[in-house]
Amino acid sequence: MISFEQPPTYGTLTQGYHEEHPAYDFACVPGTPVYAVHSGELTSDYNGRMGNIAVVKYNGRTSSYSHLQVVFPPGWYERGEVIGLCGNTGSWSTGPHVHFESDKPYTFFGI
């Protein structure tokens, strides 16, 4: 079972981390707050498949949160601060959820 000191959102874990899906998906009600799992500089992006994406970078760590309804303004955010809202954007979204991934999965996922 995975646990986070600061989860990316409060919802139901619907998809786990594995080779074909190197991320965790959390189903959530649209508009549910999405939290930074670590402090860092927030930027945003849009991708046709992943929708609105929040990206937090600091000290060699990068985490991303996809399919968001809203990404908050760029800037510095502390761990636990709201960086966006759960949504259902992008063609790969199968319903309202947050697709959370990291470039260093062992940092958050213990793998």
Task: Locate predicted features.
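Zn2+-dependent peptidoglycan hydrolase active-site motif and core
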Residues: 36-71, 87-92, 96-98, 102
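Flexible, active-site-adjacent loop/turn segments at secondary-structure boundaries
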Residues: 2, 24, 66
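Intrinsically disordered, low-complexity
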Residues: 1-14, 104-111
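Short acidic/polar mixed-charge low-complexity motifs
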Residues: 20, 32, 61-62, 107
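Acidic, glycine-anchored pre-beta loop/turn
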Residues: 71-81
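Residue-level preference for non-acidic, small/hydrophobic
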Residues: 13, 40, 80-83
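Catalytic Cys-His active-site segments of thiol-dependent hydrolases/isopeptidases
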Residues: 66-67, 79, 110-111
